[in-house]
Amino acid sequence: MQPEEGLDVSLSRPLSDDEGLKWDALTSLRERLFKAKHSYLFVDPTSGVPWDRSYTKVGDSYSEVLVAPRKLNLPKDACPFLVPLSNEVGGIFDWTFEIAWSQLSDPQAPYPVCAWIGSDLEVRNLQSRMSKQMLQSVGVRTWLFRFYDPRVSQHLVSFVSKEFCISGPTSWSFLDASGRLQKLPVSETESIRDPEESSLERLDWLKTINAVINTWPSLTDDIVEIERIYDAARVAAAVGLQPCQQADCVAFILHRCLVHERIELHPIVSVWLNDAREMKRPYADAAAHAGADVWKGISAGDWQLGLNERQGLRYG
C-alpha cells in the first residue's frame, strides 16, 4: 500500500528548539484552518491531562461541545469535545498549538489536542455527524473508535485502511510524531465505514508501530520512511507474531529495518520466530543473547547465497 497523497511519511523526532519546523506548521495550519466557514478544535480530555478551562469559558458557561455517542454512556469528563475557534493571534488557537507541540515530547502521555477542524457545518450539526462516526460496530460488539488520537490518525490511511474517510469536516489537521502538519481525507457524503475484521487486526498493531517509532532515535540518527516499518509489521504478522507480544514485535521490526530487510529468512532467526510463535522463548530474549558473530553474519547477508541455491535461484 502506498502512502496517501499529501501525507509526509518520513520520520524524525521534533526538537524542542526546532523553531523553523514549528513556525512552518503553525503558519500553514492557520492558513488552512481559517479558510473554512467554521473552525474548531477537537479535544480528548483523557484522564490526567491538565486542561485549562479558562480558555473555553464564556461568561458562566463553556464553549465546549461534547462529542460522544449516547449509546456508550461516557461520563462527561471523559467525552471528547469541540471548541469553536476564531483567528485571533495569541488566543486559544495559538495556545492549543503550543500544547500540541509540547505533547509530542512524551509519546506515552495522553494527547489532549487531537485535531483542528474546518467545516461548513454549524457546531451542533458537526457534533451529530462526528458522534455517529465515533461509534463503530462489528457483529454484536460496539465500541468507541478513537481515530482522532494523532498516534492513531497518522497511520490510518497508509496502514489501517486506504478507504478511511471522515464526513463533516472540510479539513482535518493534526501534528504527527515528527512535528509535521498532516491531514486526513474528508468527504461531504461518505462517512467512516464499520471496519472489516482485517482493519481491526491492523489497528491492534498501532501501539507496536508507535513503540518502534519512539525507539528508533535511540538506535540510529537516520531518518526512516515509515513504509519500512509498516512492511516489517506486515511481515511480523505473516510469520505469526501477535501484537500482544509487543517486545518481540518491536525487536523484530527494528531488526528488519536496521539489520537486514529479509531477516526472517535467516536460518537462526527463523528458529527464534518459530519459538516465539509457539510461546517457547521470546524472540527478543533469543536475539539479545545472540553473539556478535551471529549479528555480523545476519547483517552481511552472505547467508542469502545458500538460501538462493536451495531455492534454485542461483545465477551467473
Sequence positions of predicted segments:
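A contiguous, surface-oriented mixed alpha/beta subdomain in the mid-to-C-terminal portion of proteins
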Residues: 1-58, 63-77, 87-88, 98-100, ...
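N-terminal accessory/precursor segments of enzymes
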Residues: 97-107
